[in-house]
Amino acid sequence: MLILYKFPLSPISITAPLFLENCQAGFPSPAQDYVERELDLNEYCVMRPAATFFVRASGQSMTDIGLNSGDLMVVDKAESPRHGDIVIAEIEGEFTVKRLLLRPRLTLQPMNPSFSPIYPDPETLQIFGVVTSFIHKTRGE
């Protein structure tokens, strides 16, 4: 299941420092004290503002890629879906988020082995957009 509603894209540019050094996920290294540039998340996540919307995920079918219930997805309606993309699709009147597989057979693949693949009719499958990013909070509100 997917909770579908649009969040307005803000024309206001909010930037934050983007550090030159990467952050080690393994053995820590000494921190660098300088900033490479400012990062605007609108620039980073939204390539086509007129074709982009945000939607919250619901359910557990995509947890193996780190997409959890409540996460905010950035969806581009103008992006052409390709094999392997994460997409928002309509199946039997319901919206769903799944990995699109075009070969060997058209499949909407959940990224959690507890869920079964969906084999939609190619004539009726509607893709509403490609998920280009998602925001996963690591700390509760």
Residues of each region from the PLM?
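Structural motif
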Residues: 70-71, 85
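C-terminal structural segments of small proteins and small subunits
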Residues: 116-121, 126-134
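Short, well-ordered loop/turn sites that connect or cap secondary structure elements
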Residues: 67-68, 81
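Short, positionally conserved secondary-structure boundary motifs
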Residues: 1-63, 83, 94-95, 102, ...
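Catalytic Cys-His active-site segments of thiol-dependent hydrolases/isopeptidases
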Residues: 107-113
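Compact nucleic-acid interaction/catalytic patches
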Residues: 90, 97
